[in-house]
A protein has these predicted regions:
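Short hydrophobic/aromatic beta-strand micro-patches
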Residues: 221, 343-345, 405-407
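Conserved PLP-enzyme active-site core in the AAT-like
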Residues: 13-17, 79-310
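N-terminal "arm"/small-domain region of PLP-dependent enzymes with the aminotransferase-like
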Residues: 2-60, 68-69
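PLP-dependent enzyme catalytic core of the Aspartate aminotransferase-like
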Residues: 118, 127, 145, 292, ...
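Conserved small-domain helix->loop->beta segment predominantly found in fold-type I
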Residues: 270-273, 277-279, 284-288, 293-295, ...
Length: 424
């Protein structure tokens, strides 16, 4: 039987009560290790011939439910939960491009991801070319002989610009490259990138998946559609791996080879493991994902209407507005709405921006987004402060740019708070 999203977000991974305790809620399996039935059972687990828990750094039964649920919601074959979104992105890029690989990346991405690609990963031999994702010829033109993936976000950070995922997927696959899509801001409730050609989907589960500003976590989802053996560019996944008994992950586990490789090699060796408690908290968030997103979207629409008419606002950067350059893409990829994280330009300069932010009462000034509580920040001096002036302008960030993350409070109270801050 096929179930709707709202049912899947509650039940996948635990279709029946916990067999050991009859608990209907997913238990927190707070353990480091697991008893094997006998020596052969242990050998089969380590040889990947029998799926199941080996050691807490790699797997946990609470974590397993979270992974199965997100994989189902995204339409993937398997997922891996890790300690943070940064870990999910780092592992994904390292698995694809280690030892001299190259990435083509959308230039308007989260500042932390941009910093990882531009400054940290070159020390590991991984280079990146940043491109305007709207210029498809630039995307294709940036591909080199050693390119190993194209990397984009469903909704850019902080301005919610939207790439044409279908078109970029076609370019990636024309050159036998996997397309990696960060769907943190989109969420599988609003858009499923795998349906548009993505091969790998990553999330900072800290954001909408958790939804309450309490829990760090990251997710990597494997579409199962990329043929790692046929292409020949990824020997760590397809060829016999010397650090894991000579196993070819593509042969041993088939479509789930990518996330299995990361779990068995990168997670094993570097240990960005999600805790059972954090996996449990993220599951609580998943169970209300659709309900929260509906309210986020409703509130965002009302706030945008207010800001668009305010005399102290120079411009609102939201793809739902008809004058936004990505409006057509927004209607195509987000028919049910989206983008509750967006920016606007306040008239004046940085002084006016700081004054407005510092006078808000309900909106919290902090670096997180996608919380049930409404949030605000000045990107140029915080989240994107590592970027040069040229890089900030390329990312569409000015000294007058203010980022809002619209929560689920009553929208009348949010608008009243914005209004008093403008008038302070």
């Amino acid at each position: 039987m096929s179930y709707k999203f709202e049912t899947l977000q509650l039940h996948v991974g635990q279709e029946q009560a916990d067999p050991a305790t009859d608990s209907r809620a997913v238990p927190i399996y707070q353990t480091t290790s697991y008893v094997f039935h006998n020596s052969q059972h242990a050998a089969d687990r380590f040889g990947l011939r029998d799926a199941g828990n080996i050691y807490g750094r790699l797997t946990n039964s609470t974590q397993d439910v979270l992974e199965k649920r997100i994989a189902a919601l995204e339409g993937g074959v398997a997922a891996l939960a890790v300690a943070s979104g940064a870990a999910a992105i780092s592992y994904t890029i390292e698995a694809l491009a280690a030892n001299g690989g190259h990435i083509v990346a959308q230039k308007t991405i989260y500042g932390g991801s941009a910093n990882l690609l531009e400054h940290t990963l070159p020390g590991l031999g991984i280079t990146t070319t940043f491109v305007d994702a709207h210029d498809l010829s630039a995307v294709e033109g940036a591909i080199q002989e050693n390119t190993r993936a194209i990397y984009i976000e469903t909704l850019g950070n902080p301005n919610s610009d939207i790439p044409d995922i279908d078109a970029i997927a076609a370019i990636a696959h024309k050159h036998n490259l996997p397309l990696v899509v960060d769907n943190t801001f989109g969420t599988p409730y609003l858009i499923r990138p795998i349906e548009h050609g993505a091969d790998i989907v990553v999330h900072s589960a800290t954001k909408f998946i958790g939804g309450h500003g309490t829990t760090l976590g990251g997710i990597i989802v494997d579409s199962g559609k990329y043929d790692w053996k046929k292409i020949g560019k990824f020997p760590g996944i397809a060829a016999p791996n010397p650090s894991y008994h000579g196993i070819s992950f593509a042969d041993a586990v088939g479509p789930a080879a990518f996330v299995t490789y990361i779990r068995a090699i990168l997670l094993r060796d570097t240990g960005a493991t999600i805790s059972p408690f954090n996996a449990f908290l993220l599951l609580q968030g998943v169970e209300t994902l659709s309900l929260r997103l509906d309210r986020h979207i409703y509130n965002t629409k009302k706030v945008i209407e207010y800001l668009s008419k305010h005399p102290k606002v120079e411009k609102v950067n939201h793809p739902s507005l008809k004058d936004h350059p990505d409006h057509a893409l927004y209607e195509r990829y987000f028919p049910n709405g989206g983008a509750s994280i967006f920016t606007f330009e306040i008239k004046g300069g940085v002084k006016e921006a700081f004054k407005f932010i510092d006078n808000l009462k309900i909106f919290s000034l902090l670096a997180n987004v996608a919380d049930v509580k409404s949030l605000v920040i000045h990107p140029a001096t915080t989240t994107h402060s590592q970027l040069t002036e040229e890089e900030l302008l390329a990312a569409g960030i000015k000294n007058t740019t203010i980022r809002l993350s619209i929560g689920t409070e009553h929208v009348d109270d949010l608008i009243a708070d914005l209004d008093q801050a403008f008038n302070a």
